[in-house]
Structures are given as C-alpha cells and as structure tokens.
Amino acid sequence: MSSKELRYAIAVMVGVMLDAVFFWKFQPYSAREHGHDLLPWYCLPVLAFVAGLLLSIGIEGKKRWVPLAILGGFFGANACLIVADCATDPTNHNLWPFEFVMIAAASSPAFLGAAVSGLLKQRKV
C-alpha cells in the first residue's frame, strides 16, 4: 500500500469516527437527541479542517481525494447507522436526506484544509 492509499484509508476511518462521535454517540436512537454530547457540535468542522490539512500535506497531485474520502467514510457510516436504526423502528430517520446535507456542510472544512495544504506547499517552493 502506498503512502497516498494509506492516507485515503485513514481519511475514510476519520469520517467513520466523526460519524460515531457526532451522530451515533454510542447511544440508542431514542436517547441520542436528549443525551449529552461527547464533543460540542462546533468541534466537527474544526476536526474536519485539521484532518483535511494533515492528511493532504505531502500528497502529490490532486488533494481533493482526501476530503472526499473523509466525506465518503462519514456518509457510509451514517447510511449503516440509518439502516440499523430503521430495522428496529421504520419511523426513525424520517428526514434522512437532511442528515446527509448536514454532514456535507459540517465536514466541508476538510476541503479548505486540503486547499491550505496546497498553499503551504506552494509557499515552500
């Protein structure tokens, strides 16, 4: 596995972990909205930015694949969560498309982080 492929795999795992911490919260569906948060919501864009920045530093070529891998991991984990929750009660996640819109908006700073890493590389040259 090359360094680039390893970074993509780590980016997918980061997306899965972001979903576990901010959406699943290690709680059943009925307790997620009323329970305490593991981290406050404003940490999600910050963590996405940092992950996009750190994982795309040193990658040659197009850096957009790192944030896309983060987003893909986040989407995949949330889709699995929706399927698991709806297996017990089909009325859970009635507004599931909006969950994906929120995920895309909240993790979009990963693209900014990848762009900043490109600017840092240009500045060093």
Model-found features: residue ranges?
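Alpha-helical transmembrane segments of multi-pass membrane proteins
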Residues: W24-Q27, P67-I70, H93
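Alpha-helical membrane-associated segments of multi-pass integral membrane proteins
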Residues: T91-V125
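Alpha-helical transmembrane segments
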Residues: K4-F22
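Interfacial non-cytosolic loop connecting adjacent transmembrane helices
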Residues: Q27-W41, A77-M102
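Central hydrophobic cores of alpha-helical transmembrane segments
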Residues: K63-G76
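Canonical alpha-helical transmembrane segments
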Residues: L44-R64
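Structural signal for the C-terminal ends of transmembrane alpha-helices
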Residues: E5, L54-G61, V116, L120
